[in-house]
UniProtKB/Swiss-Prot annotation:
It comes from Pectobacterium carotovorum subsp. carotovorum (strain PC1). [4Fe-4S] cluster 2 binds at C94, C98, C101. This is Lipoyl synthase. The keyword S-adenosyl-L-methionine applies. It is found in: Cytoplasm.
Amino acid sequence: MSKPIQIERGVKYRDADKMALIPVRTVVTERQEILRKPEWMKIKLPADSSRIQGIKAAMRKNGLHSVCEEASCPNLAECFNHGTATFMILGAICTRRCPFCDVAHGRPLTPDANEPEKLAQTIHDMGLRYVVITSVDRDDLRDGGAQHFADCISAIRRKNPNIRIETLVPDFRGRMDRALEILTATPPDVFNHNLENVPRVYRQVRPGANYEWSLKLLENFKNAHPDIPTKSGLMVGLGETNAEIVDVMRDLRRHGVTMLTLGQYLQPSRHHLPVQRYVSPDEFDEMKAEAIAMGFTHAACGPFVRSSYHADLQAKGIEVK
């Protein structure tokens, strides 16, 4: 029997080391077939990478993180080349270990008290008018990191009074009331929390999370701020069916959510959950039509769509695929 991994504070555990800590064994094995990517999943890289390197340098200089890099997002080159990024606060080490996600797991460091001001200054220097702030899960904090979110929102608005802020929050497991008390007092312009997939596969895809809890988080925020849009996103290709995705869309509408993103899951490494199917652009179009018919005001559905992909355009209702 192999010795258990000793988790050291501040150390990032990724790939095989991270997956070894998941009690539900669902990761890919050598014998499992890896599906070949269809033509529509091929990524075109920009010819000039100077803008990309500039954003990376600004992040490093200020000790900030982007979920684009930490989660190995396939849209990194496109978004960075257009001067946009999704900032990830509260460090780059997550207390969860979801087998679809490339963000490192471990025992995180104490939050950086200067991060809100550094974030606000970086956003000002980049000249952004719309920003998405997300975070790792911080189950080690009594409020799940909610106060840090609020501090970041306040600092950003002080430095950038005309900016719009979208927050992509964790589920605040066991801390919802306290977290919402804080966030409803300092609300963003868009409140986003991803369900990720369908309830049937939650035990494998989101160990430690609860489908009903996530729906309740979205509903409770909406009840506190009926005027602020709530948003959620799902990945396809993890064993669900299109019919199950549509059922989740109905659940989201019943809980007051009006903005939706649907995108294709891509396996970050051979140690992560395998892709079980590739959904065609036509199928995404069909699901978008279903979403609009249900009453979603915004629905970004396509192979490369991610929760924060062109979030500024999503918020304006401009079609994103």
